[in-house]
A protein has these predicted regions:
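Residue-level recognition of alpha-helical structural elements
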Residues: 41-45, 91, 114-122
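Short, flexible domain-boundary/linker segments around small modular repeats
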Residues: 1-17, 75-87, 130, 138
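Preference for long, well-ordered alpha-helical segments
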Residues: 98-141
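Amphipathic protein-protein interaction modules
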Residues: 62-115
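Alpha-helical segments in soluble extracytoplasmic regions
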Residues: 37-76
Length: 141
């Protein structure tokens, strides 16, 4: 199972505000990692990857400022997984799905957040996630 699918599963299973924030932060971080792997090569998704990068970074940074985001766990360095390198089209599809799920979960978390700062982070994070999804599906600005 590749990292994108692992994070997507964690995001699907997240229910508490802290779980959603943690999984959404990791989702944005994984989006940025995926973009880094494909940004140097020409291809049909090159422009979308370049355009979606700032939105993913903005989402990660916004979620990172949420008061209810727990401190990161220190498990030590992760060993790289051996996975087949997906095509840029497969990456775009996986990132679009992850971004759509993040947007939905963050919208749900925003309604349950007690703190205005948490609510704002969830709403802004959902907007950034939707922007990433739009770029990856070709429906962006």
């Amino acid at each position: 199972m590749n990292p994108t699918h692992v994070i997507q599963q964690r995001l699907e299973e997240a229910w508490s505000l802290a779980e959603v924030l943690t999984a959404a932060y990791d989702a944005f971080d994984e989006m940025l990692s995926a973009f880094d792997r494909y940004q140097n090569g020409p291809g049909p998704f090159y422009a979308a990857l370049i355009m979606a990068g700032p939105a993913a970074a903005g989402g990660r940074n916004t979620i990172g400022m949420a008061p209810s985001l727990p401190p990161p766990e220190r498990d030590g360095p992760r060993s790289p997984e051996q996975v087949d390198e997906p095509s840029a089209q497969e990456v775009a599809g996986a990132v679009a799905g992850l971004a759509a799920l993040a947007a939905r979960k963050l919208c749900m978390a925003a309604t349950a957040a007690n703190s205005p700062a948490d609510r704002s982070a969830c709403v802004s994070g959902a907007q950034y996630a939707d922007e990433v999804r739009a770029f990856m599906t070709g429906t962006g600005p």
